[in-house]
A protein has these predicted regions:
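Solvent-exposed loop/turn segments at secondary-structure junctions
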Residues: 5-8, 36, 48-52, 84-87, ...
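Sec-exported extracytoplasmic/periplasmic mature domains
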Residues: 28-36, 62, 66-70, 96-104, ...
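Hinge/cleft segment of the Venus flytrap/periplasmic-binding protein
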Residues: 49, 53, 64-68, 159-208
Length: 208
């Protein structure tokens, strides 16, 4: 193996999302919207059971919720997990059925962007925005629309522009100056409804 190849392998790093940390950040951000009184009934949707990205995101969400429960012993905090599917129609059916059976659900956490379909279910049923808190991962048009409508309160942005841009910059610095690359966690960008107008403008420029 050549010296340059050895150097390249020694500086190999990752630019992307730490799934567990991102899930934790999502739940922590959403906790700011939890009702101040009464029981809290949380539902965590694992869209792809057995797949690392979904399981670890869910693990991060549940880690925070368990910590929250331990810190609020004066409140009833219930945490459930469900296979919520990776299809908007299926997610809507499964979570819609769950909400029918459990109308006192406080919040639903998705490990992808499929909570957008749950928002539509709530709207179609005449449920007011914020009655069931919603949050998930990735910025897609459906999610941004539901954030503007008030149904989705928190979303994790993987910041794909940064995922593409930063590795190129690090490769350039390694090649020109011999600088060692670093791991970059791009996946804990928290987006709330107030951010949507700016994001939509930047999306038109290919930056978000």
């Amino acid at each position: 193996r050549s010296t340059s190849t050895a150097r390249w392998h020694s500086c190999w790093r990752s630019s992307g999302s730490s799934f567990v940390a991102a899930g934790y950040s999502l739940a922590k951000a959403q906790s700011e919207n939890f009702p101040k009184e009464g029981p809290l009934n949380m539902l965590v949707g694992v869209n792809a059971p057995g797949q690392t990205w979904s399981e670890q995101r869910a693990a991060g969400v549940m880690k925070f919720l368990e910590e929250y429960k331990a810190e609020h012993k004066d409140r009833e905090v219930n945490i459930q997990r469900i296979d919520s599917a990776t299809d908007l129609a299926l997610t809507a059916d499964r979570i819609g059925a769950y909400l029918n059976a459990n109308p006192d659900t406080t919040a639903y956490f998705d490990t992808g962007f499929w909570e957008a379909s749950v928002a539509k279910v709530l709207k179609d049923r005449g449920v007011a925005p914020g009655k069931v808190l919603l949050g998930g991962f990735d910025l897609v048009p459906e999610v941004l629309q539901q954030m503007e409508a008030g149904y989705v309160q928190v979303q994790v942005d993987q910041q794909p522009y940064m995922q593409g841009f930063m590795p190129v910059m690090q490769a350039y610095l390694w090649k020109t100056a011999g600088l060692t690359a670093a791991d970059i966690d791009t996946g804990q960008g928290i987006v709330t409804p107030k951010d949507v107008p700016t994001i939509m403008e930047m999306s038109k420029k290919g930056l978000r």
